[in-house]
């Protein structure tokens, strides 16, 4: 069995993520999806909790026709020691044989650790970007909904994610500034 690794923050998950995961699953038997920065939430870059991201990702993948029995979702908190990063994430995961990333820095760390790295499938990178989707939410551009599965949009509505982002950007969501 070949198990692949795909790391992201998924803030929020969008169709590009779903399509990338489907493409990865065409090459491997199972995919481990690491929800990185698991400890961060309620900040502009990471507005959703890890629990919300697991929920959104599972529902988005289900909506996209992904066989969830082939998917392992694991939240992993960041560490500030890049040299120890790979050992850190491996301690959270079952074994994997290949990793998919579009991030050159992550690819470097993985390769230095002896991991086979493949280019992450990317679908219309200019359109399907979580940062852009969050910016659209903040600006009141409702077309962000076209970029995420309907189930993800419903969850964002349920947790009042757009309202949360708008409060977060006021700066009051940064305890280190209080």
UniProtKB/Swiss-Prot annotation:
**What keywords does the record list, in alphabetical order?**
ATP-binding, Cytoplasm, NAD, Nucleotide-binding, Nucleotidyltransferase, Pyridine nucleotide biosynthesis, Transferase
Q: What is the protein's major site of localization?
A: cytoplasm
Its GO biological process annotations read:
NAD biosynthetic process
Q: Known catalysed reaction(s)?
A: beta-nicotinamide D-ribonucleotide + ATP + H(+) = diphosphate + NAD(+)
Please give the Gene Ontology molecular function terms for this protein.
ATP binding; nicotinamide-nucleotide adenylyltransferase activity
EC nos: 2.7.7.1
Q: Highest taxon of the source?
A: Archaea
Q: Which InterPro entries match?
A: Cyt_trans-like, NMN_Atrans_arc, Rossmann-like_a/b/a_fold
Entry-linked SUPFAM superfamilies: Nucleotidylyl transferase
The answer on whether this UniProt entry bears the keyword RNA-binding reads no
Pathway linked to the protein: Cofactor biosynthesis; NAD(+) biosynthesis; NAD(+) from nicotinamide D-ribonucleotide: step 1/1
Where is the protein found, in the record's own terms? Cytoplasm
What cellular component GO annotations does this protein have? cytoplasm
Q: Belongs to which family?
A: Belongs to the archaeal NMN adenylyltransferase family.
What name does the UniProt record give this protein?
Nicotinamide-nucleotide adenylyltransferase
Source organism per UniProt = Caldivirga maquilingensis (strain ATCC 700844 / DSM 13496 / JCM 10307 / IC-167)
């Amino acid at each position: 069995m070949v198990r692949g690794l795909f790391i992201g923050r998924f803030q929020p998950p969008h169709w590009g993520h779903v399509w990338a995961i489907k493409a990865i699953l065409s090459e491997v038997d199972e995919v481990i999806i690491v929800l990185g920065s698991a400890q961060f939430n309620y900040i502009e870059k990471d507005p959703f909790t890890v629990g919300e991201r697991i929920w959104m990702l599972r529902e988005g993948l289900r909506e996209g026709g992904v066989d969830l029995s082939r998917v392992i979702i694991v939240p992993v908190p960041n560490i500030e020691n890049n040299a120890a990063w790979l050992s850190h994430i491996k301690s959270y995961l079952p074994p994997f044989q290949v990793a998919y990333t579009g991030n050159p820095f992550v690819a470097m760390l993985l390769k230095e650790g002896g991991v086979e790295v493949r280019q992450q499938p990317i679908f219309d990178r200019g359109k399907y970007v979580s940062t852009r989707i969050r910016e659209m939410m903040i600006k009141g551009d409702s077309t962000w909904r076209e970029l995420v599965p309907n189930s993800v949009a419903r969850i964002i509505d349920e947790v009042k994610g757009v309202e949360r982002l708008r409060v977060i950007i006021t700066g009051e969501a940064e305890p280190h500034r209080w």
